[in-house]
UniProtKB/Swiss-Prot annotation:
Residues 1-21 form the signal peptide. It comes from Leptosphaeria maculans (strain JN3 / isolate v23.1.3 / race Av1-4-5-6-7-8). Residues 467-486 have a biased composition (Basic and acidic residues). This is Phomenoic acid biosynthesis cluster cytochrome P450 monooxygenase. It comes from the Eukaryota. Heme binds at C519. Pathway: Secondary metabolite biosynthesis. Its cofactor is heme. Pfam families: p450 (PF00067). Its EC number is 1.-.-.-. Belongs to the cytochrome P450 family. Induction: Expression is positively regulated by the phomenoic acid biosynthesis cluster-specific transcription regulator C6TF. Cytochrome P450 monooxygenase; part of the gene cluster that mediates the biosynthesis of phomenoic acid, a long chain aliphatic carboxylic acid that does not appear to be essential for pathogenicity but may play a role in allowing to outcompete other fungi in the environmental niche via its antifungal properties. The polyketide synthase produces the long methylated aliphatic carboxylic acid chain of phomenoic acid. The cluster-specific cytochrome P450 monooxygenase may then hydroxylate the methyl group of carbon 31.
């Protein structure tokens, strides 16, 4: 037999094998019984996932419309821009479709997409039937499993310890740290004068709030075990080459990029290869993050062994984590050193990006909607007296529980501009699940399940809730349904209700997930964002900075455009505009 015949035979066998696998996949997808959408590519291809979301609008301008309509729903973050069901033709029809679930079929696999609140609730409740995907380990589990990436009994062990740690002591520490770093970092923006006429125009508000958020997470994460805040002003002590803040920030900012590669590979990246300097820097940051925290954990373990009390002035995550891990009698239920480091990274990376993103949206929303800012200012003035120089202490147990409107503002920001646009799970085995129409759907094992968070947060069930809590000056928009409007008052129940804040129906509000795997840092995030808004509005007002001749309506339209200019890089965030300027004016 000639070489050509051998080659052709092997090629035909390969094609037949691929065709058989594809046909079997189609049969499995059809057996689910939901509408199917075919795309002419592998939607899970690593390079496509990595590059397509960054080049979404470029692809849209280059591709023919018929091809773009097919490929657009394979781009990560498509749910921010497209209808919740691609079978619908109207781009505004995010939630009015009859079928809120469909199957996306590519060349290698298929995905089950849903915006059905009943399905979302069931998937998030059944944590052993629908597990965290392995892909998450490449992003957040470089040092070992943690509470965000583990499954099964391993997850239960992590969850038990982490929930002991992220408690009211941490929430109080976050509240106090938020006030401290707000005063320290925003002193040149939140200026005051005796005649109350101080006003500052700045393009640095986003950057400063990001710096505050990062400082809070480090401070609450490792406490004051060493002077990390001013460390970059000094030469790092050997064997370190980077300040702790710089190492952690470099690692976190690249967690969804080059940091998915092993640190050993990055640290030995060839000098002749492209990106040599960046690769080595990221690799070094990962190595030093691990080294630093191993040292801190060793210090804490030695302190506990000697029976000494903590020297930190506030509760910190790493000390509480070591204490909680060592408190159990069964050593198999404790966390290893690498698992503690992994949980610390998940705590910092997960919190930093999501909280900083929420603060960006919150600032734009404050400037865009003066009605709601006035509504918040009424509450701020009732909680925090105007007298004093602003340095007097504020009590967490007194202030935070009464910040009802401010927390409602935070919740509405998370509803419309939350960092998670989708939640991803894998069916651990064949599963059955009932959709809202009453039909039972059977999902084969290893089905990739995606919950469309954006669509859930725009459901008609959000419409016209708690209008009695609206400010007197509020007027509904004739141009958009209520669920698409930013209306924080929907979160405040009337007096005499069982709960102060509205509790959405199950499966309709999932910015921090839901069920047993709800984000353990949810309360911490709410406390931080709420406290920083209170600090911003304590004596000041935030307004859009207007160009000469620009009206307030023009400025507000510009902010509307900014709110639509979002990007997806693992999480949802505002596209940063270095020229976006705000006026911060003293009001009392």
């Amino acid at each position: 037999m000639s070489f050509a015949r051998i080659f052709i035979t092997i090629l035909l066998l390969f094609i037949l094998r691929r065709a058989f696998k594809w046909l079997k996949m189609i049969v499995d997808a059809r057996s689910i019984g939901l509408p199917m959408v075919f795309v002419p590519m592998d939607q899970t291809n690593f390079l496509w996932v990595l590059l397509s979301s960054r080049n979404r609008f470029r692809l849209q301008s280059l591709l023919p419309l018929w091809l773009w309509k097919r490929l657009s729903i394979t781009i990560p973050g498509w749910e921010l821009f497209e209808p919740s069901n691609p079978l619908e033709t109207s781009p505004t029809s995010r939630t009015e479709a009859t079928d809120t679930s469909f199957i996306l079929v590519g060349l290698r696999t298929y995905d089950f997409w849903t915006a059905d609140p009943q399905v979302a609730h069931e998937v998030l409740r059944r944590i052993h039937d629908f597990e965290q995907p392995r892909e998450l380990e490449f992003l957040l589990a470089k040092f070992g499993p943690n509470v965000l990436t583990a499954n099964g009994d391993q997850w239960a062990r992590h969850r038990k310890i982490v929930t002991k740690v992220i408690n009211e002591r941490i929430s109080k520490a976050v509240f106090e740290s938020s006030i401290y770093y707000c005063r320290r970092i925003l002193h040149d923006v939140l200026t005051t004068s005796p005649d109350k006429s101080s006003s500052v125009e700045t393009t640095m508000l986003f950057d400063k709030l990001t710096q505050i958020s990062f400082s809070i997470l480090i401070g609450v994460g490792i406490g004051d075990k060493f002077p990390w805040y001013d460390e970059e002003k000094q030469e790092p002590e050997p064997p370190y080459q980077m300040a702790y803040k710089d190492a952690l920030l470099t690692y976190v900012n690249n967690a969804f990029g080059v940091a998915i590669l092993p640190p050993r590979l990055l640290n030995h990246w060839p000098s002749w290869a492209p990106g040599h300097k960046k690769m080595r820097t990221v690799g070094r940051s990962m190595t030093e993050f691990c080294m630093r925290n191993k040292s801190l954990i060793d210090q804490e373990q030695n302190r506990i062994a000697r029976g000494e009390t903590s020297t930190s002035s506030n509760a910190d995550f790493i000390a509480l984590l070591v204490q909680a891990s060592q408190s159990g009698e069964d050593s198999q239920q404790s966390l290893s050193e690498n698992e503690m480091i992994s949980n610390l990274f998940a705590f910092t990376a997960g919190g930093y990006k999501t909280i900083a993103g929420a603060l960006d949206f919150a600032v734009v929303l404050l400037a865009r909607f003066p009605l709601w800012q006035d509504w918040l200012i009424e509450e701020v003035d009732s909680l925090i007296p105007a007298d004093g120089d602003g340095s007097e202490p504020l009590e967490y147990t007194t202030i935070y529980p009464q910040a009802v409107r401010t927390l409602a503002f935070v919740m509405e920001t998370e509803r419309l501009y939350g960092s998670a646009s989708r939640l991803f799970r894998i069916a651990s085995g064949p599963q059955t699940i009932q959709v809202s129409s009453g039909t039972t759907v059977r999902l084969p094992a290893k089905t990739r399940v995606h919950i469309n968070v954006v669509a859930l947060h725009h459901l008609p069930s959000w419409r016209d809730i708690n209008h009695q809590s609206d400010p007197d000056r509020f007027k509904p928009s004739p141009d958009a349904p209520d669920e698409k409007l930013f209306r924080p008052s929907r979160w405040i129940n009337p007096p005499g209700s069982k709960y102060t804040h509205f509790h959405p129906p199950k499966g309709t509000f999932v910015p921090w997930s839901q069920g047993p795997r709800i984000c353990p840092g949810q309360k911490m995030a709410q406390v931080e964002i709420t406290t920083l808004i209170l600090c911003l509005l304590r004596r000041h007002r935030i307004e859009p900075s207007r160009l000469e001749g620009e009206t307030l309506q023009d400025a507000e339209r510009g902010l509307d455009a900014k709110l639509q200019n979002v990007q997806w890089g693992g999480i949802v965030s505002l596209e940063k505009d270095p020229h976006l300027k705000f006026r911060v004016s003293q009001r009392r």
